[in-house]
Amino acid sequence: MQTATKPLVGARAVPLSRRASFLVAEARRKPSTNARRTRVGSTSTTTTTTTILTDVNGPALTTVAKPGHQYDLKQTVEMKATVSVHMKSFWWSDEKKERARDWAYDLILGSWLTLELVSSELDPKTGQEHDVISGKLKHSRETEKDYDLYEAIFTCRHRLAPSGAVRLVNYHHTEMLLGEVKIFPAGEDPTKSSAVTLFHCQSWIDPSHCSPDKRTFFPVEKSYIPSQTPKGVEKLRKSELEALRGNGCGERKKHDRIYDYDVYNDLGKPESKRPVLGGKEHPYPRRCRTGRPRSKTDPSSEEESHKKGEMYVPRDETFTERKEQAFLTKQLLSQLHGLCTGLKVNKDILPSFPTLASIDALYDDDFRNQPVQPEGGKVRLILDLLAKELVHLVKLEGAEFVEGIRRVFKFETPEIHDMDKLAWFRDEEFARQTLAGMNPLSIQLVTELPIVSKLDELKYGPADSLITKELIEKQINRIMTAEEAVAQKKLFMLDYHDLLLPYVHRVRKLDNKTMYGSRTLFFLADDGTLRPIAIELTRPKSPHKQQWRKVFTPGSGYSGSVTGSWEWQLAKIHVLSHDTGYHQLVSHWLRTHCCVEPYVIAANRQLSQMHPIYRLLHPHFRFTMEINAQARGMLICADGIIEKTFSPGEFSMEISSAAYDKQWRFDMEALPEDLIRRGMAVRGEDGKLELAIEDYPYANDGLLVWDAIKQWASDYVAHYYPCAVDIVDDEELQDWWTEVRTKGHPDKQDEPWWPELDCHESLVQVLATIMWVTSAHHAAVNFGQYPMAGYVPNHPSIARRNMPCEMGPEEMLAFKAAPEKVWLDTLPSQLQTVMVMATLDLLSSHASDEEYMGTHQEPAWQRDGEVDKAFQVFQKKMRDIAEQVEEWNKDDSRRNRHGAGVVPYVLLRPLNGNPMDAKTVMEMGIPNSISI
């Protein structure tokens, strides 16, 4: 007698022919008809034929018959389907009538959701696909978390092979979120049965009157490269991809799920035109095509969306209805966008803070930086109060404005200010944050002297820097020569000179904004910490003025005078505003959000949902397109928050394009290659990286995470691609990577550095790079924004006044008479500060349903024993990394991450426990995707 057995957790999936023991103890019978009906796995002495229905992706239908018995093609079996459905939620009371309409619809129509079972194999008689088995689902009166359960019973003939796909049609009047579909023998408990076929969908299904096409889903039991696709679903695999590509025509509707490409021609407005990003003049990655009509006032650009902040993204890329925090965030960003409009109309509402104490007054010392606020908490409070107070606030001035802001915004004290109220002032902290702050991706090694610009001298002025060998030696107290400092890797630099200099005169024409090209030089002390030794600010020559430039040093100007110390603090404001702008526009937006969107689009257009690489990358793409669309609508658009509160102003996105053109290379986006490019690491003879600064928290933690990601990707790839020819012959994989290059990044498609997917090593490097950028890279530059830049003197986003010494004797006299006033006038205005704080606070938050690296496991990974085992190894490595980071943060010798008043570096510490137990948002772990 055969008995049902349950596979061991982590056991590798076995071929169908070896799975005869996966039997069902009981099955449901129907009254007999001319066709004999048999329990699946029956152990009756009179019926010994067993039909296996559990391996839905087997290469062929297999039957096991004991000797002396024949297989009866007329046998049938009853299978049950359960479907979890989440109907669209309703937020406001005036929409409750929609819920009543739903109930009435269910009562009248009864069954509005149909399900079809599709065989994984062809009919051996016809050589064509089997006829599908269709049925209507009915409400089971059961619920599962936020989902209602629907079910149906299907009678299947034995000759129908296991389900290779399911197809659904929604005849309801509204869309629904499809959770999971389970197919299993009737009479079995799906939570205990080993014969369950699972379809993990998590997809919005439109009403049939909006989209008559049937929605297709494939089971998670096994992933297939194209050549291994079961014959019965080969056509469905191809047709699903064709549906997602669309035809490139027409305006996209909200319910569409089409992925296509377009240039960034939607950032301008009729009254504020902006150049198109993407093309020869302004190279840029591509974004998702919306198909909106061209603007009548600017034919090169799209019309604005009819609803402010509403931009098309494929339906399954949008936030789930259950993400109330995301919903409120979107509304608040819209309100902040309204503040930007107020700035444009009311140019006189740009008062400076009257004192440093007035800046500190914005924070509530009793309100600590808690990771999550209940039921929207702070965000809902801000939204409600903004709606009532916005008009009143913009009319206030001076102290009244500050007090009004305090009433509306209950800002927590950022960690940098909470740990040490004077941290922002210290030069040591200024230098430390280049290694462990919110932008640790810009610091680079100085490899030669003199420091020379690559810009045209005739256009911009002399190329040689004023930071000379003599100045360097003086600043390091002549303990070594400048040449020795270079040879011993003691000199490091923040270099924003060549990137910003071409925009200086254009930015200076804007109201209340200024800019320089800047270089900041640091010296590496014997204790492993950096200290700044010089800042060079440059204004390029113009038709009316000669080049102006000057070097500022800490405590050295005017022979160590007080005036020189104040000038040093002003110079730091300018450098920090450059660093903040570069961080937001390049390190953050360009290198993560913007450059990743083409990977997402190409993956959905070219990789089937049953493709193993799609299933590996899918969790790393979660919500990225929706966040990017919101950014285009409210953050990076004309007169948006970035333009109004960051130094480059309306030229912000042009600078981002220039950085993409001159700096971005896919092969340099992997952490090791990025460190090597900046001179921050070299590869030793043993292949291991040696850091130029041993205590470099971002690199120390990041390399551990990178190695874990790469090993996980390597194990995964090895499981599905035993040899290189499998990679080369995978048409979907090759088409995906070709499309990333030719359609997603077409302005760089002919660059020689694009890797070829021709072996295990190259594929792993490509996948690990994408996984790194979407997870750890983004976490490092995103979740430290408010903790570090939420206190404006520590990392101002804008500098509003030129250096007094540039402007002449009168400005210098005014500066000497009131240096603190000039310093405060150089910082962002009160309103700009509040806008930046509110925006960074939101962007730095974690979603309530965040999926964290090393903790979230896709259902498809769990179903494959080898993949599950590899993930467990990855998971353990991430836990080990978390423990290592904790040890380093307690190590007195690591002064860049531990010490009195020093904020520990935890941005790349993997989640180890419950994220809700974290003390700060920075400690909550590394999300899989570019998400907020």
Curated annotation (Swiss-Prot):
It catalyses: (9Z,12Z)-octadecadienoate + O2 = (13S)-hydroperoxy-(9Z,11E)-octadecadienoate; (9Z,12Z,15Z)-octadecatrienoate + O2 = (13S)-hydroperoxy-(9Z,11E,15Z)-octadecatrienoate. Its cofactor is Fe cation. One of its GO terms (biological process) is oxylipin biosynthetic process. Residues 270-284, 295-311 have a biased composition (Basic and acidic residues). Keywords: Chloroplast, Dioxygenase, Fatty acid biosynthesis, Fatty acid metabolism, Iron, Lipid biosynthesis, Lipid metabolism, Metal-binding, Oxidoreductase, Oxylipin biosynthesis, Plastid, Transit peptide. One of its GO terms (molecular function) is linoleate 13S-lipoxygenase activity. SUPFAM superfamilies: Lipase/lipooxygenase domain (PLAT/LH2 domain), Lipoxigenase. One of its GO terms (cellular component) is chloroplast. This is Lipoxygenase 2.2, chloroplastic.
